[in-house]
Amino acid sequence: MALKLISLNIEGKRHLDKVVPFLTEQKADVVCLQEVFEEDLPKLKDQFYSNHLFLPTWHTNQHFNLEIKEGYSPGEKLFGIAILSPLPLTELLASHLDPKLPEIPKNSGPGTWNPGLIVAKAGDLTIATTHFTWTRFGQADERQQQHLQILLNLLDPYPELILTGDFNAPRGEEIHATLASRFVDHTPDVDTTLDPKLHYANRNEPGKLKLVVDHLFTTSTITVEEITVKNGVSDHCAVIAHLA
């Protein structure tokens, strides 16, 4: 089944004026989103993406970029990951990765959400998406390593799948290397998935920070015909894949 898939970290409410028209224009078969407020799903779905799955990973009222001094507001709004599609979606799995945290903890600082994983069937394809564990400098720590093992164990039952999302794990570092040894990495030629202007680290010096942290992996049985990245939509670039 030919399929167009988009993965995008939308950074909460910051870029909805760009994200909504982008998704409407793209008319993808499947959209995997990270950092989504549940209350914004009707707007994001527009009239094209009639089906969705959502997994909350945080209670928060305010976004969380410490570097731009916004402060922290735990709040009660549900914030997490989502899959949108005009195709029927069958949820196969929705799980959090940190058994030591409440399923939906309150925002108490950067990286304090409970990382999540959704696995769903869209048409003939099994699609998994995650907003993976954050570390301050993108270096793997013990918690991130533990969560990776949990994620891989959760994916074991699916012999054929697409895995995408914001992994908070730069290409070439330990977490990415482990994933790339198990799956086919389809973004080896991508220069960065951090927007050169909209990401907080690039706002004063465009293009200063270049990291590939948004990845698309598949099992070897799936053919990806083309991968592109699109900036100017959010603080992360949109990863757009055309699958055979």
Where are these regions (language model features)?
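Structured beta-strand-rich core segments of catalytic domains in phosphoester-bond hydrolases
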Residues: V36-D124, T228-K230
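Charged helix-capping and loop-helix junction motifs
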Residues: T112-W113, E142-Q149
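Active-site beta-strand/loop signature of hydrolases that rely on acidic residues for catalysis
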Residues: L5-N9, V19-K45, L84, I127-T130, ...
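Short hydrophobic/aromatic-enriched beta-strand-loop microsegments
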Residues: L8, S50-P56, V184-P188
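Active-site-proximal beta-strand elements of phosphoester/diester hydrolases
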Residues: A2-E11, L93-S95, D124-W134
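Metal-dependent phosphoester-hydrolase catalytic domains
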Residues: D156-L161, N168-A244
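Conserved residues at the C-terminal ends of beta-strands
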Residues: Q34-F37, L55, S95, T133, ...
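Short, flexible loop segments at the rims of nucleotide/cofactor-binding pockets, characterized by
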Residues: S7-G12, P105-G109, G138-E142
